[in-house]
């Protein structure tokens, strides 16, 4: 089976996101508050006809507050010293922001009330408070609240206990400028469809997590032969293709290879709905596969929906796509158990967008405190 292998260029300045270094507002750099920071990434193309939009993603910490009440801000005495756990909150897509420097100032006074509830599994309820005008038209800000699986956005939900009020303060802001055609996610009911009349095409992406030699992540993920971190495999359901007469005439192997070549798939990663895999079909999309892509051939897959555990690892370390390949499987589970997977490497890793920048923001630290930061704690391996 022919292969196309286009490795990413690590030297390209467009392939990384600027890190969030830990900075304190004190002269000695050893105590004080964390300094709020913004990271900016441009995915817009010079000749793009799509109007630009901005994705805003925030990272920070959840604190417990004394239920006696009072006016809230980051220095309120009612907040207990030391964070409870780390959190990611994506505000989603919104209109173009002309001056990125205004975003940090706009977030002063903004915070999120966080509560736990439960249905089939633990859920987190986020209520946005004091939403700034600048961000009022971003997706989550317009809704004002969000209910989702607690494990998606909260690093360690088990640390949040009944009888406390919890507040999330964003500390690090990721601002991504991109064309509006990147605002497309595949409907979840479509991703869940299984039928004996179709084949499922999945994409396996191998990420290299750029962690330090003493990182606890090395105990969780596969060893990197190059010694640059560790490796993680993620599978994403790309699309379904219909079984037809051509398969019997040409054979499944040949048919699958021709479909992979004709679709001309590329893959990249960006910080939009959190760390997000972007798959683009630059060629012909089969009719059965059309619902999995936008009219421009784009499909965005937020990693928190696919692999929440890996997403949390990416809050604190950078990553790069080292390999991507397609897997053809029977869609029907009974048929899948009787057949072998077919694998092809007909994937291009999009040059300039195969890296997710390393961040010094580390949710695996125990004692980072926004109101009263006195020292950085030791690594928390939980």
Swiss-Prot record:
Record localization: Virion
GO biological process entries: virion assembly
GO cellular component, one term: virion component
InterPro entries per record: Matrix_C, Matrix_N, Matrix_Paramyxo_C, Matrix_Paramyxo_N
Major location category of this protein: virion
UniProt key word Metal-binding: no
One Pfam short name: Matrix_Paramyxo_C
The keyword Oxidoreductase appears for this protein: no
Keywords of this entry: Viral matrix protein, Virion
Single GO molecular function: structural constituent of virion
Gene3D superfamilies assigned: Viral matrix protein, C-terminal domain, Viral matrix protein, N-terminal domain
Top-level taxon in the UniProt lineage: Viruses
Its biological purpose: The M protein has a crucial role in virus assembly and interacts with the RNP complex as well as with the viral membrane.
Family the UniProt entry places it in: Belongs to the morbillivirus/respirovirus/rubulavirus M protein family.
Name of the protein in question: Matrix protein
């Amino acid at each position: 089976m022919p292969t196309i292998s286009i490795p990413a260029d690590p030297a390209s300045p467009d392939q990384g996101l600027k890190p969030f270094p830990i900075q304190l507002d004190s002269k000695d750099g050893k105590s004080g508050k964390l300094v709020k920071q913004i990271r900016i990434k441009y995915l817009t193309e010079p000749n793009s006809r799509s109007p630009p939009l901005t994705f805003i993603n925030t990272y920070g910490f959840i604190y417990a507050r004394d239920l006696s009440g009072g006016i809230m801000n980051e220095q309120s005495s009612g907040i207990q010293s030391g964070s409870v756990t780390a959190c990611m909150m994506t505000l989603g897509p919104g209109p173009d922001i002309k001056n990125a420097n205004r975003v940090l100032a706009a977030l002063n006074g903004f915070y999120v009330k966080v509560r736990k509830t439960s249905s089939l599994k633990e859920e987190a309820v986020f209520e946005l408070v004091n939403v700034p005008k600048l961000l009022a038209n971003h997706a989550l800000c317009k809704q004002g609240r969000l209910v989702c699986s607690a494990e998606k956005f909260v690093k360690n939900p088990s640390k949040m206990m009944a009888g406390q009020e919890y507040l999330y303060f964003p500390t690090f802001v990721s601002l991504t400028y991109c064309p509006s055609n990147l605002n497309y996610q595949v409907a979840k009911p479509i991703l869940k469809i299984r039928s004996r009349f179709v084949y499922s095409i999945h994409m396996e992406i191998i990420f290299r997590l750029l962690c330090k030699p003493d990182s606890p992540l090395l105990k969780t993920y596969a060893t990197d032969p190059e010694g640059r971190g560790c490796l993680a495999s993620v599978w994403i359901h790309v699309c379904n293709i219909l079984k037809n007469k051509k398969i019997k005439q040409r054979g499944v192997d040949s048919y699958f290879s021709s479909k992979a070549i004709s679709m001309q798939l590329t893959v990249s990663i960006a910080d939009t709905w959190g760390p997000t895999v972007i798959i683009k079909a630059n060629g012909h999309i089969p009719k059965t596969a059309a619902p999995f892509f936008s009219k421009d051939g784009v499909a965005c897959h937020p990693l928190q929906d696919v692999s929440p555990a890996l997403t949390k690892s990416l809050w604190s370390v950078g990553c790069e796509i080292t390999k991507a390949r397609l897997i053809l499987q029977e869609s029907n589970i009974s048929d899948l158990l009787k057949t072998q997977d077919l694998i092809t490497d007909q994937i291009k890793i999009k040059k300039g967008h195969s890296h997710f920048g390393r961040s010094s923001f580390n949710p695996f630290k125990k004692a980072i405190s926004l109101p009263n930061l006195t020292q950085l704690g030791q690594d928390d391996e939980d």
